[in-house]
Amino acid sequence: MRIIGLTGGIGSGKSFVAQVAEKYFSVLHISSDEIARRQMQKGGISYKRVVEEFSGMTDDLLCEDGEINRTALSKLVMNDPVLLKKLDAITHPAVIDEINTIIAIEDERKIFSAVMVETALLYEAGIDRMCDEVWYVYAPLATRSSRLIKMRGYSTEKTEMFLKNQQPEEEFLRRSDRTVPNGEDVTESDMIKIISAYLNC
């Protein structure tokens, strides 16, 4: 079973590419963000350690229902490399373990011809080491900025902060096997053709 790592900068449209692949091809879509989010919910494998490590650093880490306030946590670690590294050390191993488990199960079931692991932190988390190939989703910076503002409701300041903290595009291109163009003018039909060509190589 082919394992594809799907990565790209914030706002590049990774989820769109993965959803098209899952809808029209024999591809299982795994989102590392969704796994990490679920694991940080109450009762999740990462919840207790995240609360223990970060609750004393901000008053609003927990929502009224006891769930982790992801916005507050993001603000806390965004501009502090030490805290970000601490958070990654908690969450990344658990996410990788679950991805490996899913892949092992699907390899036995033999339903899908490929697994597409969508993640923004492919190299940082070491997920690239489990992949047969890496696809980089590319969109112009202006397009990514527009998507974050229009689709996610980010302020201009927040958008600039996120884009500033991204890995350089040249690094993505250098380390990826294939580039998936996903600018504003790319339609679902266009994406089907792109994915089909890459899967049939």
Predicted regions and their residues:
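Hydrophobic anchor at the beta1->P-loop junction of P-loop NTPases
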Residues: 6
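P-loop (Walker A) phosphate-binding loop of NTP-binding proteins
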Residues: 9
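ATP-binding Walker
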Residues: 12
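Walker A/P-loop
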Residues: 15
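Short beta-strand-centered segment that lines the nucleotide-binding/catalytic pocket of NTP-utilizing
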Residues: 27-40
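ATP-dependent small-molecule kinase phosphotransfer cores
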Residues: 37-111
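NTP-dependent small-molecule kinase module
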Residues: 101-114, 128-137, 141-154, 164, ...
